[in-house]
Design a protein with these regions (language model features):
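Glycine-rich phosphate/ribose-binding loops and adjacent secondary-structure elements
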Residues: 137-181
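N-terminal capping/small domains of soluble enzymes
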Residues: 1-134, 145
Length: 181
């Protein structure tokens, strides 16, 4: 038998690196937009048992999911939810969502018929109200504002790792250069 080190460190230079037991993470899948509360909590419990993290996805922070997770990545979306300092401080890492897959710079809509119960409560909107997810972050009018936002997150969280989720263009290196400035 050969020993294989599976421990994975996200943000090794962060004040509070995220140290996972295995190099596998649950991807971002949102409560109420894609998954039910029961599924989100089950994924959080499963990731906790194997020593890895779960990800909020584009939806709001679900307190029951956070309580069940050992490690939690908060996806910071262009929506109006999960932006409070108290919410940010619950994250073991923050992923700034700029795009994904083939939908860079595209917003979204949560139909009113899907906005009820717990989802309406956590989004802080009336039941039945359609929710628009903007195509871009209001606080990021220019690429140089990304550093300011990341610095704010580092400050309020005590230094958790900050990453981005993007759908790169045909000029990947240029996209990455803008992201790391």
């Amino acid at each position: 038998d050969v020993y294989v080190e599976t421990r994975t460190v996200i943000g090794p230079k962060a004040k509070k690196p995220l140290v996972l037991d295995i190099p596998i993470m649950a991807g971002g899948m949102a409560f109420g937009l894609g998954l039910s509360e029961h599924v989100k909590v089950a994924i959080a419990k499963g990731t906790a048992k194997v020593g890895t993290c779960t990800n909020s996805g584009e939806g709001p922070l679900l307190p029951e999911e956070r309580a069940a997770a050992k490690y939690y990545i908060l996806q910071y979306s262009a929506g109006t939810w999960s932006k409070e300092t108290e919410t940010l401080r619950q994250a073991d890492a923050i992923e700034i969502r700029l795009g994904q897959g083939a939908i860079a710079g595209v917003g979204g809509v949560i139909p009113g018929e899907n906005v009820h119960g717990r989802l309406a409560e956590l989004l802080n909107v009336p039941e039945g109200k359609q929710v628009i997810i903007p195509s871009k972050h209001e606080e990021l009018p220019r690429s140089k504002d990304l550093k300011r936002l990341a610095d704010r997150f580092r400050s309020v969280t005590g230094g958790v790792p900050i990453g981005i989720k993007l759908a790169p263009s045909a000029w990947l290196e240029a996209d990455l250069d803008l992201a790391i400035r």
